[in-house]
Amino acid sequence: MRLISLIGAAIWVDFIVMMITKLGPGQRVPFLPPAGALNLWYDKFGLAAVSADVLSAVIGVLLATFFFPNAWGLGLVFASIFIQVLHDLFFYFVILAVPQGQNQMIDVFKAYADEGGWTILLADALIMTGTVTIATVWDLLFSYRFIAFQTLLGMYSLIYITYTK
């Protein structure tokens, strides 16, 4: 998997998450976390929040390729979800240990964890699934130049939706 495909896919998946979160207020999907703390995350931290989301997905998939070097397609999806679940559980214990008020981002994550509970694991698994699937399809179908264009277009679009109310 090309890194440009992975980064571009993570950007577009985050764009989709933000569209659902920002443009569908009040639309509660029963098996996904509520959008309250997630909207606060994007509203308060803007592009830093977007960067953290995209980098989290990219690093998770890259770790999956390191630990499971022969994984591809559905195997890579499952490997990425495995890494993501480990990360989410570890990160949950980290945020519990950080006192309220010490880190603004961690404070929002605490609210998100309280609000979303186990549904966060499912939402993050869908993010990993989308990222791996899009990156894999792009690698199979498109040239490097076209993927680079899609990635830049995604970055450009993500900047604008980040500041949409």
At which residue positions do the language-model features occur?
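Juxtamembrane/disordered regions of integral membrane proteins
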Residues: 1-119, 129, 133-165
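Phosphate-/polyanion-interacting regions in eukaryotic proteins
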Residues: 122
